[in-house]
């Protein structure tokens, strides 16, 4: 029985996987079976870490806001600041508040004074 070479479909599939693994090293770059395993693993990690990145950034923003509120005596804690913001219906998300807390803490103090005046 003569040998039948595989068609272009398998070659196209392998070159596509190889293009995903272009920055890998060693066997992860050269061997087809290892390439498919590592590319699948990389895709799983990237899918998982897209969700994790959102959680991590939210945690970072909350930490920055909490530190700024305690240092500059805006309110006693982060939770009281967020509670008063929502009670007064001021629409500032945590990302914006963290940016204000890091770049210009005086504006954070001004925001807290606005909340107290509305009371």
Curated annotation (Swiss-Prot):
Q: Does the keyword Plastid apply?
A: yes
Q: Name one GO molecular function term.
A: structural constituent of ribosome
As for subcellular location, the record says:
Plastid, Chloroplast
Alphabetical UniProt keywords: Chloroplast, Plastid, Ribonucleoprotein, Ribosomal protein, RNA-binding, rRNA-binding
Q: Which SUPFAM superfamilies match?
A: Ribosomal protein L20
- Domain of life, per lineage: Eukaryota
> GO cellular-component terms in the record?
chloroplast; ribonucleoprotein complex; ribosome
Per the record, the major location class is plastid
What InterPro entries does the entry give? Ribosomal_bL20 (IPR005813), RIBOSOMAL_L20_CS (IPR049946), Ribosomal_protein_bL20_C (IPR035566)
Instruction: Set out the biological process GO terms recorded for this chain's protein.
Output: ribosomal large subunit assembly; translation
Pfam families cross-referenced by the UniProt entry = Ribosomal_L20 (PF00453)
Biological role: Binds directly to 23S ribosomal RNA and is necessary for the in vitro assembly process of the 50S ribosomal subunit. It is not involved in the protein synthesizing functions of that subunit.
Q: Record's family?
A: Belongs to the bacterial ribosomal protein bL20 family.
HAMAP family, A to Z: Ribosomal_bL20
| Family matches, as NCBIfam families | rplT_bact (TIGR01032)
What PANTHER family does the record tag this protein with?
Answer: 39S RIBOSOMAL PROTEIN L20
Q: What is this protein called?
A: Large ribosomal subunit protein bL20c
Organism name:
Zea mays (Maize)
């Amino acid at each position: 029985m003569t040998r039948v070479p595989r068609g272009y479909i398998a070659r196209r599939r392998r070159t596509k996987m190889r293009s995903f693994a272009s920055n890998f090293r060693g066997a992860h770059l050269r061997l087809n079976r290892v390439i498919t395993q590592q590319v699948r693993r990389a895709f799983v990690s990237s899918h998982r870490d897209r969700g994790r990145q959102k959680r991590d950034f939210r945690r970072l923003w909350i930490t920055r806001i909490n530190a700024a509120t305690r240092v500059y005596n805006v309110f006693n804690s982060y939770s009281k600041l967020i509670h008063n913001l929502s009670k007064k219906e001021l629409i500032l998300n945590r990302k914006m508040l963290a940016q204000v807390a890091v770049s210009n803490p005086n504006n954070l103090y001004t925001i807290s004074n606005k909340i107290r005046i509305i009371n």
